[in-house]
């Protein structure tokens, strides 16, 4: 139902769950809630393209992404409906290794989904300690119709940290393209670009979230057609670029 006030249409059947379930319109949500919504939106976008994907989320709590796990658990039923599985990590390294393994799903037979997406999350110190997994994951490459976001929680003002943090150098060193959303709208929009960048390049996409964005609330416009991504017409060695995986991470196979 709608009513008209000062020439504007007012939605009267509002639900707190609209921030996750509304397909088209305006929603209000926090930065952490936007990360949850991003998982759902990416799955919906893949279904529109005829791709049935599953998603694995793992990592370790730590501000400013410390409440992501709570929000994932609270919305388990909704996540299950969108093929999203959450397995918290004992630490950041094990969470990253779990996501690393998810990208090998296409290497085995009888797979359940057309592709597996991943989302790793951790505070800046977790980015530091998980660098070895990040590098190995990027040498392997993401799976077909897959893609991974490495959500790095930075606390530059030390709101709840002993030291200020800036994760870009570590993410760059791990060969990741980096996205840095400045509000909840950009989490939803740039998140879609980040997944497509990962899928196209074969690399994990770094996704930097600072305290003010994670803890803050804002409004965002949602629409299945809002983000229209054009895949580059890029050739490599005279052939159209297509990412392929390489699991031979030993000896001369890892050298140029």
What label would you give each PLM region?
Residues 7-101, 125-128, 219, 254:
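Metallocofactor- and cofactor-centric catalytic cores in central/energy metabolism, strongly enriched
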Residues 63-199, 210:
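Thiamine diphosphate
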Residues 4-38, 42-45, 181-256:
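Flexible, low-complexity linker and terminal segments
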């Amino acid at each position: 139902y709608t009513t008209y006030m000062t020439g504007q249409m007012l939605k009267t059947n509002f639900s707190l769950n609209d921030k996750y379930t509304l397909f088209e319109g305006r929603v209000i949500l926090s930065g952490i809630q936007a990360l949850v919504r991003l998982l759902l939106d990416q799955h919906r976008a893949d279904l529109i393209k005829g791709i049935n994907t599953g998603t694995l989320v793992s990592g370790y709590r730590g501000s400013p992404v410390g409440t992501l796990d709570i929000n994932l658990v609270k919305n388990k039923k909704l996540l299950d409906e969108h093929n999203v599985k959450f397995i918290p990590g004992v630490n950041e390294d094990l969470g990253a290794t779990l996501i690393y393994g998810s990208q090998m799903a296409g290497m085995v037979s009888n797979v359940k989904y057309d592709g597996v997406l991943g989302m790793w999350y951790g505070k800046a110190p977790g980015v530091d300690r998980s660098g070895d997994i990040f590098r190995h994951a990027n040498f392997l490459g993401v799976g077909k119709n897959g893609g991974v976001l490495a959500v790095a929680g930075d606390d530059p003002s030390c709101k709840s940290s002993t030291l200020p943090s800036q994760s870009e150098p570590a993410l760059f060193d791990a060969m990741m393209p980096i996205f840095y959303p400045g509000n909840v709208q950009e989490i939803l929009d740039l998140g879609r670009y980040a997944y497509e960048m990962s899928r196209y390049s074969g690399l994990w996409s770094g996704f930097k979230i600072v305290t003010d964005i994670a803890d803050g609330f804002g409004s965002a416009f949602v629409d299945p057609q809002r983000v229209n991504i054009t895949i580059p017409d890029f050739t490599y060695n005279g052939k159209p670029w297509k990412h392929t995986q390489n699991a031979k991470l030993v000896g001369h196979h890892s050298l140029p």
